[in-house]
Amino acid sequence: EKTLFNSAKTRLIPIASNIPSCQKKEKKFDLVHFGIISKGKGIEEFIWIIKELNKKNIKFRSALIGYVPGADNSYANLIIEQCTEQKCELLLNKSAAEISNLLAETDMAILPYPDGISERRGTALAAMINRVLVFSLRGQFSSEFENIAVLGNDKNDLLSKVLYYINNTDSFAKINDSAYEYSEKRNWQSIAQ
């Protein structure tokens, strides 16, 4: 049987984050979601988690750090409206350096990708390299993230893990350190070698 690629000569090249690392700063945000504001990024689940935390009268600061693509703004406008209703700060169309600084002021990134976290998620790598604890969903390619992110099976499970973290912040230090080490090895310079 003939294949398109010779597997002995083919290698999968991992990705790295385009967001640089930044020294950790005084906390400004408890939780953020960031990336391109478009469908299929888990933004609705992030907003749902914020809404549930607000219902429980938990004090926290949240932000949506996002890039609004120029084509169809109807989805972005809906998300912006929902964030505003939940008192989630909107930080739109920031540079990579600005995003790095914002992440350095953040505790948790809620990144519930519908297909689960995987090595192709540059936003998760950007959070990890900036020492932000990543909360995401399990997926088919999530096994290597079991010890470097906090994974849930669905949004309710993720919410319970966020609530646990809020009350036990020190219990996740090892995961955060491991995530930083993982992401540090996944920079473009290392990949190019």
Stretch-by-stretch model annotation:
Residues 24-41, 47-50, 176:
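Conserved donor-binding/catalytic core segment of Leloir-type glycosyltransferases
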Residues 66, 76-97:
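Nucleotide-activated donor-binding/catalytic signature segment of Leloir-type glycosyltransferases, i.e.
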Residues 146-156, 163-169:
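Conserved acidic donor-binding segment of nucleotide-sugar-dependent glycosyltransferases
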Residues 31, 46-49, 62, 127, ...:
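A structural motif in glycosyltransferase catalytic domains
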